[in-house]
């Protein structure tokens, strides 16, 4: 009998699509957030939770160069939640929907026996520039990320440490204040609402893109799968929040590992044509170039400051992928 451990998540999805008559990768983004799996209501502000759910699906649209249009939300509400709490979640949803420019938003409520469940779907309009001339990817095209990586995972670690202290009656909240930028990256990730429009205005069209949801390693593997090329990521070019290494030493955790395999950064990863490098650097200074496409036989690797190439490993992928 085949197990998920044998084939990995990506191969499982590929096999399920085979013979179904449908293709993967439709321009509809979907996300399900489950209490106890994706969030802890003990410390997660409900308004931030609603906002984060919308950011998760909006980022998928941005990665495909779509302008957001329609948002659909279904809340599975458990008995422990009252109307004011549901209203807080909805306020976070509508705030994010306005920020990101959605034209239509729908909401449905369903009962849940197993805690809060948030199901969000989004669709949008494709950028007109991609209809005319989406460039083909080439070796040396740039891997560009929209913000700091590993911050959300480290922020979650801070919240879990504070929860343990709170349960022991030792909470002083000093660490929350000290690492508030990391905590904020976890509780309320944000994307530039105008990123697709800015790319259109600059006439820079990425040849591929994805949203970083399960670490940079997973995202780079997805890019390699999309383009058919290998990819190199340089450890000394990964952008980090200011005190990531300070916290990493305290937790005995390598921030590079958090960036490569941590989750929920919700930053964009675009493949930008090498010929557009100077223009991209000038017009998109909040992005960092972390690597480039390579020959397919290279695979996907992390290059250390010493020049050693380490194969990327990511949850949901087989070891040889």
Regions found by a protein language model. Give the residues of each.
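Extreme N-terminal cap/leader segments of soluble proteins
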Residues: 1-45, 73, 92-95, 321
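Glycine/charged-rich beta-loop-alpha catalytic/anionic-binding loops adjacent to active sites
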Residues: 35-43, 126, 177-182, 252
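Polyanion-binding loop/helix "lid" in catalytic or ligand-binding cores
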Residues: 173-222
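Short, surface-exposed beta-edge/turn micro-motifs
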Residues: 25, 141, 265-268
């Amino acid at each position: 009998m085949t197990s998920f451990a044998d084939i990995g998540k990506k191969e499982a999805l590929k096999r399920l699509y085979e013979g179904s008559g449908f293709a993967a990768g439709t321009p509809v983004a979907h996300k399900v957030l489950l209490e106890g799996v994706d969030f802890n209501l003990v410390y997660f502000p409900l308004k931030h939770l609603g906002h984060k759910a919308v950011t998760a699906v909006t980022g998928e649209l941005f990665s495909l160069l779509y302008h957001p249009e329609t948002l659909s939300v279904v809340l599975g509400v458990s008995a422990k939640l009252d109307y004011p709490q549901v209203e807080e979640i909805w306020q976070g949803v509508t705030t994010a929907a306005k920020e990101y420019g959605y034209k239509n938003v729908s909401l449905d409520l369903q009962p849940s026996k197993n805690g809060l469940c948030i199901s969000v779907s989004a669709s949008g309009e494709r950028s007109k520039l991609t209809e005319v001339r989406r460039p083909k990817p080439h070796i040396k095209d740039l891997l560009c990320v929209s913000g700091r990586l590993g911050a959300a995972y480290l922020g979650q670690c801070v919240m879990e440490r504070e929860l343990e202290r709170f349960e022991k009656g030792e909470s002083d909240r000093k660490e929350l204040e000290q690492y508030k930028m990391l905590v904020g990256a976890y509780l309320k990730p944000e994307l530039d609402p105008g990123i697709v429009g800015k790319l259109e205005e600059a006439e820079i069209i990425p040849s591929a893109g994805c949203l970083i949801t399960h670490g940079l390693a997973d995202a780079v593997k997805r890019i390699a799968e999309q383009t058919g090329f290998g990819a190199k990521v340089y450890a000394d070019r990964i952008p980090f929040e200011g005190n990531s290494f300070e916290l990493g030493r305290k937790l005995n955790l390598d921030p590079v590992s958090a960036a490569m395999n941590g989750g929920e950064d919700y930053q964009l990863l675009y493949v930008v044509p090498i010929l557009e490098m100077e223009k991209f650097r000038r017009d998109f200074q909040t992005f960092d170039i972390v690597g480039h496409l390579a020959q397919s036989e290279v695979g996907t690797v992390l290059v250390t400051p010493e020049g050693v190439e380490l194969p990327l490993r990511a949850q949901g992928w087989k070891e040889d992928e």
